[in-house]
């Protein structure tokens, strides 16, 4: 069992903050909709009175609904079960509000299907639902998050190699678990952040600004070096080649219908570029948006680093103050060093059929 400080148990920023700052994830989801339509067409041919659709890693649910609607449009006169799952630490109150309001709207619009909704507080690196109980599963913008940070080995292996191996193990574990849960002929749709074949660094400007803001805080004795050393976001960006090699291990279980990568731009960049010469106000607004987007994912890991690196030496008020300091510095450094730069990310997309 991994040491608790290495376990990935940090949720996305709660109280609706993540859902309010997930525009890039929404853009990535839109590119996956054709895969959902293809999978829905296959489901429509299944001879079953009940169809179950499960999402692995729902967060607050704001990017779950359009894929669900794409599926529902192709399914007629059946009992539908929609299951939303995420780690126990997730903000299920926000998820419940998002999903309930959406479902109530469907019912008011005379949805033809009996609709049953469940939420499951369980990591997708564990079995989430009973065997052979789902017809379609999907996970969007989540699988680059690892189960835990691999600990250093005695022979001093390179950290990037350890992360690559952990990413391989985690994706293999995920596919094995889903193969138990999804019926033969069912579908699994995945999208996650990948390493761009074009060679660019994903959201390089915000990452650089975050890093330099933390260095600045250490240099000014705002935080000790131990906090900076404890800061880890347990992710790994797989290459398309990594994923293809892994899928070769599952040819008896999963059939690959689609496997490709695509670039996803933060939509705020398009809004900025509508202006031929963006004003200072527009540039500051852009910085606010893209850094708030990154912090919706990273802020919890900064707070965890404060707790681990100081061995619980900060009060909650001090943690909140230091977090706000880091966020403010990051925005200032983004404007100074990366003003108006595009924020782009490579995503890998997969559509699988359970054999």
Curated annotation (Swiss-Prot):
GO MF annotation, one: metal ion binding
**Ranges in coiled-coil conformation:** none
Any matching Pfam family? Methyltransf_7
Xref: InterPro entries: MeTrfase_7, MeTrfase_capping, SAM-dependent_MTases_sf
Q: Name one GO biological process term.
A: methylation
Entry binding sites for Mg(2+): 231
Q: Where does S-adenosyl-L-homocysteine bind?
A: 18, 63, 86, 123-124
Q: Give the transmembrane region(s).
A: none
Record-given protein name: Methyltransferase FUS9
Lineage at the top is: Eukaryota, Fungi, Dikarya, Ascomycota, Pezizomycotina
Q: Which gene encodes it?
A: FUS9
């Amino acid at each position: 069992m991994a040491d608790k400080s290495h376990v990935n148990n940090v949720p996305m920023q709660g109280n609706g903050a993540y859902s309010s700052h997930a525009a890039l994830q929404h853009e990535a989801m839109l590119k996956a909709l054709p895969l959902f339509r293809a999978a829905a067409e296959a489901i429509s041919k299944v001879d079953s009175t009940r169809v179950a659709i499960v999402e692995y890693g729902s967060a607050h649910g704001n990017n779950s609904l359009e894929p669900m609607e794409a599926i529902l449009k192709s399914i007629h006169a059946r009992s539908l079960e929609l299951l939303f799952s995420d780690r126990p630490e997730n903000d299920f109150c926000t998820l419940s509000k998002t999903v309930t309001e959406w479902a109530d709207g469907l019912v008011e619009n005379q949805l033809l299907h009996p609709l049953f909704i469940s939420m499951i507080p369980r990591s997708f690196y564990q079995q989430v639902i009973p065997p052979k109980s789902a017809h379609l599963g999907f996970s969007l913008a989540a699988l680059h998050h690892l189960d835990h940070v691999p600990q250093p080995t005695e022979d001093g292996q390179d950290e990037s190699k350890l992360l690559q191996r952990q990413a391989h193990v985690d994706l293999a574990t995920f596919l094995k678990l889903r193969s138990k849960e999804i019926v033969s002929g069912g579908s699994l749709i995945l999208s996650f952040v990948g390493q761009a074949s074009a060679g660019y660094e994903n959201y390089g400007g915000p990452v650089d600004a975050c890093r330099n803001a933390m260095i600045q805080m250490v240099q000014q004795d705002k935080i000790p070096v131990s906090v900076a050393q404890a800061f880890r976001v347990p992710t790994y960006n797989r290459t398309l080649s990594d994923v293809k090699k892994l899928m070769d291990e599952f040819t008896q279980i999963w059939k690959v219908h689609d496997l490709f990568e695509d670039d996803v731009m933060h939509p705020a960049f398009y809004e900025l570029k509508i202006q031929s010469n963006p004003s200072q106000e527009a540039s500051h607004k852009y910085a606010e948006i893209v850094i708030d987007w990154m912090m919706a994912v990273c802020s919890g890991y900064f707070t965890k680093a404060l707790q681990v690196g100081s061995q619980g030496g900060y009060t909650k008020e001090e943690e909140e103050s230091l977090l706000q300091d880091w966020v403010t510095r990051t925005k200032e450094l983004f404007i100074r060093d990366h003003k108006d730069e595009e924020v782009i990310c490579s995503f890998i997309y997969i559509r699988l059929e359970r054999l």
